Structure formats: structure tokens, C-alpha cells
């Protein structure tokens, strides 16, 4: 008799280097396969043409539309994007991961960063931005994915965070806590995926 597979949350080791301000990955895919996971880095995740995908953040579970933008700063907050009923073969995903050290205390506590500080704090439970915010930052996000490196890329990324912080009151908190542990459903794409395969492909598929 086989022992039931326990609920597992992968602790992801991200590609973010200590010498980089952020790590950005742009992918075009036909499906989401990476299992439920968490990591110590902050994450901003954008999806396009992914209507029908189920987004799980902590104890929040929602089916998303064509566009979705979420910020997660909870270091133990598990999350996953599940294929669910999505039929699109042209999914675009842009993931930006960055360390909390990017904003050292003497910097983030300045008055000019009030809105960013509040947003990062609120995002410990996951923060979903409205379409108006997505439209505001889309041109910058679109070009940042191709730039990736250099001083001006960092400035553009910080500008994106600032612009999003102006939508803090409109953005929705997702999870009821920053450390909610949900039950893992019997989704074969997640539960039966072996650790060796995860380690082999994690740089191509962050989720």
C-alpha cells in the first residue's frame, strides 16, 4: 500500500544573484506547470493572454482574466499559477524577483518612499492590481523585459514600483495572512512532478 503523498510546498531557490538588483524573466508558454512554492525574494508577476488560469496565493484562489498583475512580498507565502481552464497557446509571463535589501532602511524610510513602503508591507499577503494600474506601467514593463541590465533598467523598475504604489488603495489584498498554508490539490502536474525535474528546469519555469 502506497503512502499518501503529503502536501508539499517547494522552497524555491531563485536565480537572483547577490550582485543584482533584480532578476527578470519573460516567457511565452502554452501552459503553467511549475508546482506550488514560496521563496524569500519579493516577486512581481504579470500574465497576459492567460484567461482561465487559476492563481493561488496563500488561501486565495481566483480564476484570472486576460491580464493579471500581482506583487508578493511575504517570504513564506506560497503561490502557484495553475492551468485550470486556460486554452490560450500564447500566454506571456513576466516575472521580476528582487530582494528586500534593495531598499535598505535608511532609504525606504524617507518620505519620498512612503507609498512604496506601504505597498510592500501590504503585499506580504499578496496584492492584485487593477487594470488601470496595469495600463499605466505596461509600456515600462514591456521594455524592461528586453533591457534587464544597467542603471537605467533599475531606475525603470523603481519607477514601476512607484507608479504601482499610487494604486495601493485600489489594489486588492489576496491572502488572509502572509503565512497561510493551503491544501495542495491532487493536480498531477504539481504533485507528481519529481524534484529532479524541478531542479533541472527551474530557471526556465519559475512557476
Regions found by a protein language model. Give the residues of each.
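A generic fold-level signal
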Residues: 16-19, 39, 64, 88-90, ...
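Generic protein-terminus/edge-of-domain signal
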Residues: 1-71, 76, 113
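Short beta-strand-to-loop capping motifs
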Residues: 48, 98-100, 146
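Amphipathic alpha-helical segments within well-ordered protein domains
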Residues: 141-145
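Short, Lys/Arg-enriched, Trp-marked, Pro/Gly-tolerant hinge/linker segments that flank
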Residues: 127-131, 146-205
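A hydrophobic/aromatic-rich effector-binding and dimerization subdomain
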Residues: 2-16, 76-140, 169-171
Amino acid at each position: 500500500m502506497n503512502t499518501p503523498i503529503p502536501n508539499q510546498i517547494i522552497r524555491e531557490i531563485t536565480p537572483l544573484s547577490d550582485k543584482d538588483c533584480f532578476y527578470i524573466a519573460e516567457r511565452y508558454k502554452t501552459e503553467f506547470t511549475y508546482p506550488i512554492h514560496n521563496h524569500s525574494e519579493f516577486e512581481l508577476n504579470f500574465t497576459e493572454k492567460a484567461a482561465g488560469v487559476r492563481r493561488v496565493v496563500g488561501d486565495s484562489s481566483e480564476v484570472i482574466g486576460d491580464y493579471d498583475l500581482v506583487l508578493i512580498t511575504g517570504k513564506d507565502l506560497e503561490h502557484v499559477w495553475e492551468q485550470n481552464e486556460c486554452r490560450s497557446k500564447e500566454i506571456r509571463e513576466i516575472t521580476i524577483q528582487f530582494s528586500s535589501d534593495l531598499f535598505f532602511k535608511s532609504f525606504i524610510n524617507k518620505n519620498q518612499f512612503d507609498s512604496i513602503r506601504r505597498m510592500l508591507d501590504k503585499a506580504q499577503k499578496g496584492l492584485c492590481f487593477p487594470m488601470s494600474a496595469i495600463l499605466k506601467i505596461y509600456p515600462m514593463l514591456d521594455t524592461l523585459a528586453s533591457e534587464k541590465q544597467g542603471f537605467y533598467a533599475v531606475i525603470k523598475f523603481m519607477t514601476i514600483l512607484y507608479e504601482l504604489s499610487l494604486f495601493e488603495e485600489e489594489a486588492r489584498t489576496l491572502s488572509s495572512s502572509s503565512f497561510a498554508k493551503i491544501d495542495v490539490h491532487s493536480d498531477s502536474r504539481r504533485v507528481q512532478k519529481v524534484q529532479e525535474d524541478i531542479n533541472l528546469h527551474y530557471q526556465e519555469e519559475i512557476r
